[in-house]
Regions:
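N-terminal signal-anchor module of multipass membrane proteins
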Residues: 2, 6-41, 45
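Early transmembrane hairpin of solute transport permeases
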Residues: 31-127
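Flexible, glycine/charged-enriched surface loops at secondary-structure junctions
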Residues: 44-48, 88-93, 114-116, 193-197, ...
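Conserved phosphate/anionic-ligand binding catalytic regions in large, soluble enzymes, centered on
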Residues: 20-36, 258-275, 317-320
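Hydrophobic alpha-helical bundle architecture
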Residues: 38, 280-293, 303-369, 382-389
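Acidic-glycine-rich active-site phosphate/pyrophosphate-binding loop
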Residues: 1-11, 42-56, 236-255, 287-305, ...
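Signature of multi-pass transmembrane helix bundles
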Residues: 109-255, 422-428
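A structural signal for small-residue-enriched, beta-sheet-centric alpha/beta enzyme cores
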Residues: 2, 22-25, 54-56, 144-147, ...
Length: 428
């Protein structure tokens, strides 16, 4: 068993990475940075200039903004400036009202918001907001993490400058993980230390159930529950996993004012990691202990993979999140560490290379593909089948497999990222 100090550090890591969020985290992070700049300014900004990394721009172009019925960055920036509260972090737009949305529309129409691509930076998650008004100027910068402020300044007076610090230093030091360490923590830590993870079950299941009752995005979650689809897929554990996961994503990408529990700065990852585990646990009458440990295993696997992949990349986040849920489902099927490792290898062999072309309603389709693969990979692992080291990017050591996956997503797909962004920004 891990020492108490090691467990405390891992629990603190989970609590940093698994947090509530309303709306897609990229435009919400921009709204958060704008809100902080406006707070520093001390008055309503007359002009807001926003400069973003390409990945932030890509992920914020086509997604709904909570409570607005609108898509994209301008309304997120406007509302961040007018009603955002930075203390709410990824729920910064919690207080949005119809009146505030109307104010935001006017703010945009008055050409008070300017959004540009930040040139000459290596950081994939970078947000810089300059707010001007009443003869004053304030600047806020977020980098490395969706809520990680690294620079604050008003009228030349710098109150925070951590631009040279790493994200790990900002978060109090990175916790070194391996898949076996993730497994050991999830399966041996005292249960009372892990019960907090059940909040992800409550929040994300509620998001899916609200989506079933409404019209959100492409309505994939509801479609999978229709009579025609039931005739094809049946009313099974598998079909329920797909419908719950896609429904929660439908609502989130459409901009519903519905909170979800995010993972590593992504709400969709926070949906795809635990919800398949929750549904499988409920449908198989798993004990609370089994459910808790499976949820921790899923969430912490995602956090581990993201440590080397980075917050944003050209690789769709559902690849990572569904790998976590596959681990959790394998555990609930009675799998041991070897079978969980096999499920991870099966996932990497299958989904590596799925591109991220921004946050948008059709993300629910990708999440559904990811979690369907998660179930298949778990079933293969439990049946004794695992992709072998002679096949493609798979190696005997599961941690090396994970590093191969993250190297492809972090480094190998950079040109893919540039091409995708070029296509998205030059559409007629």
């Amino acid at each position: 068993m891990l020492s108490q100090n090691e467990r405390k550090r891992i629990i603190a890591l989970i609590n940093r990475e698994v947090v509530p969020a309303i709306g897609c985290t990229e435009p919400i992070a921009v709204a958060l940075c704008t809100a902080r700049a406006a707070e520093l300014l001390g008055s309503r900004p007359e002009k807001v200039a926003v400069r973003l990394s390409a990945n932030i721009l890509k992920n914020a172009m086509g997604v709904g903004i909570p409570g607005t019925g609108m898509i994209g960055l301008p309304i997120a920036v406007a509302l961040g400036a007018l009603v955002g509260r930075s203390e709410y972090r990824l729920e910064v737009l919690r207080d949005v009202t119809p009146g505030a949305v109307e104010q935001g529309r006017r703010y945009i129409d008055e050409k008070r918001v300017c959004i540009d691509l930040k040139q000459g930076i290596a950081e994939k998650l970078y947000i810089e907001v300059e707010a001007r008004g009443a003869g004053h100027c304030a600047t806020a910068v977020i980098a490395g993490g969706h809520t990680s402020f690294v620079y604050l300044e008003r009228d030349g007076e710098v109150t925070l400058d951590k631009r040279t610090a790493s994200a790990a230093e900002e978060d109090g030091g990175e916790v070194p993980l391996t898949l076996h360490r993730v497994w050991e923590f999830a399966t041996t830590a005292p249960l009372d230390e892990l019960r907090f993870i059940l909040e992800t079950r409550r929040l994300n299941k509620a998001a899916a159930e609200q989506a079933f009752a409404g019209e959100f995005g492409h309505c994939l979650g509801r479609t999978l529950r229709c009579e025609r689809e039931r005739k094809i897929m049946g009313d099974s554990i598998f079909s329920r996993i797909l419908s719950y996961t896609s429904a929660a994503c439908d609502a989130r990408m459409a901009g519903a004012m519905i909170p979800v529990m995010s993972n590593s700065g992504s709400g969709n990852q926070g949906i795809a990691a635990p919800l398949p585990v929750v549904v499988y646990a409920e449908q198989t009458a798993a004990t609370e202990q089994q459910t808790i440990r499976a949820l921790v295993l899923s969430h912490l696997t995602v956090i581990y993979i993201k440590q080397s992949l980075g917050r944003l990349s050209a690789l769709c986040g559902c690849v990572v999140a569904a790998t976590g849920s596959s681990c959790g489902i394998t555990y609930l099927m009675g799998g041991d560490y070897g079978q969980v490792a096999a499920a991870v290898k099966n996932m990497i062999a299958n989904l590596t290379g799925m591109i991220c072309d921004g946050a948008k309603p059709s993300c629910s389709m990708k999440l559904t593909s990811g979690v369907s693969t998660a179930v298949i990979s778990a079933m293969m692992a439990m049946d004794g089948h695992c992709v072998t080291p002679v096949e493609g990017i798979i190696e005997e050591d599961v941690d090396k497999c994970i590093r191969n996956l993250t190297a492809i997503g972090r480094d190998g797909m950079n040109e893919t990222d540039r091409v995708v962004l070029g296509i998205m920004t030059h559409k007629c």
